[in-house]
Amino acid sequence: MAGPPLHPLCAPVAFLLGDWHGEGRGGYPGMTPFAYREEMRIWHTGKAYLAFEQRTWQTDGEKAGREIHGELGYLRCLEDGQLELVVAMAPGHAEVSSGSVQASRITLESEGVLDAPSASRVSAVKRTWWLEDGVLRYDLEMSARDQPMTWHLAAELRRV
């Protein structure tokens, strides 16, 4: 049974749809650099948003094989390529970001991040996603733990 047609406002981000697997690396001031494996699923329901689920597992060091992060969220598609991201993260953060898509490049900057009482403090996030030669790449910068906006993650994912 075929699903509903893609909402026209989501056409500029249709390149994200599908199941993606890949590898990434991360680091942050005061944190030991690490490598990880990632799985991300992005789908639509016919409404003006894409839904996504993302999970990562560390591939090196003492935590090799352990899940280290997870996200569930929605990429809301607006007029003129404008976007809003609403995401909940397993470490205890909820993020609302806004930005845009141009060709196959998405840039999103946080409007606000809410931390659970037991979570570490994250004050800002910037995400950049782009598709290049069939590979979905991203960079994530954040301001956390009283640090200025600093690179945190980069990954390359392939559609499976």
Task: Show where each model-derived region lies.
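Sterically constrained small-residue positions within well-ordered secondary structures
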Residues: 31-33, 43, 66, 76, ...
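Short hydrophobic/aromatic-rich beta-strand segments that constitute the beta-sheet cores
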Residues: 22, 51-54, 83-87, 106-110, ...
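Hydrophobic/aromatic beta-strand elements that line small-molecule binding cavities or substrate pockets
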Residues: 37-43, 71-76, 96-100, 124-130, ...
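Helix-adjacent hinge/juxtasegments
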Residues: 59-98
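Acidic, glycine-rich flexible loop segments
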Residues: 90-94, 100-126
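Amphipathic/hydrophobic helical signal segments and adjacent flexible N-terminal regions
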Residues: 1-49, 57-67, 133, 141, ...
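Short acidic-glycine loop/turn motifs at beta-strand connectors
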Residues: 45-46, 78-80, 102-103
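Secondary-structure transition/turn motif
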Residues: 55-57, 88-91, 111-115, 141-145
